Amino acid sequence: MSRIGKAPIEIPAGVEVTVEGNLVRVKGPKGELSREIHPAMSITIENGALRVSRPSDEREHKALHGLTRTLIANMVEGVTKGYSKTLELVGTGYRAAKTGNQLTLSVGYSHPVVFNPPPGIEFQVPAPNQVIVAGIDKQLVGQVAADIRATRPPEPYLGKGIKYAGEHIRRKVGKAGK
């Protein structure tokens, strides 16, 4: 069995999981998520834990087993705790501001870059050079954070740009002077 796939998913108090065919719905204190899973995988709920099982030991089924279990575990954690990614703006004059629910970035272009959050995503700006992307869907939080970072990725010579908190930027040596 897949080492990841065979581990049961504990369902915390206040979280409701329903399985209808291929559709898994997870409802918790922070919201509701639903995801369609591969038809080969089967899910059983027994005494407060959810188990994912696979039909055979084929390579594809082994991979889907661990994937399905992890996706459902991420949904359960998302509706209980939520997810967030922190981005840092490094550079002179690089600033972020929240206007309503929009995020406005001044990152060295001739115009400010405006981001509208997709449903389920919230922006927080604790400092002018810091942005927190929060939500219950792990994949969506990561994608929105990656889209924001892509507006001005860190450059290797001065390290200016938008980077994830804790991300190490590989630096290059500039050209040698005479």
From Swiss-Prot:
GO MF annotation: an example: structural constituent of ribosome
UniProt keyword list: Ribonucleoprotein, Ribosomal protein, RNA-binding, rRNA-binding
Keyword Transmembrane attached: no
Gene3D superfamilies documented for this protein: Ribosomal protein L6, alpha-beta domain (3.90.930.12)
Domain of life: Bacteria
InterPro entries: Ribosomal_uL6-like, Ribosomal_uL6-like_a/b-dom_sf, Ribosomal_uL6_a/b-dom, Ribosomal_uL6_bac-type
Any GO BP: cytoplasmic translation
GO cellular component, one term: cytosolic large ribosomal subunit
Function noted in UniProt: This protein binds to the 23S rRNA, and is important in its secondary structure. It is located near the subunit interface in the base of the L7/L12 stalk, and near the tRNA binding site of the peptidyltransferase center.
Protein family per UniProt: Belongs to the universal ribosomal protein uL6 family.
Subunit structure and binding partners: Part of the 50S ribosomal subunit.
Protein name, UniProt field: Large ribosomal subunit protein uL6
Gene giving rise to this polypeptide: rplF
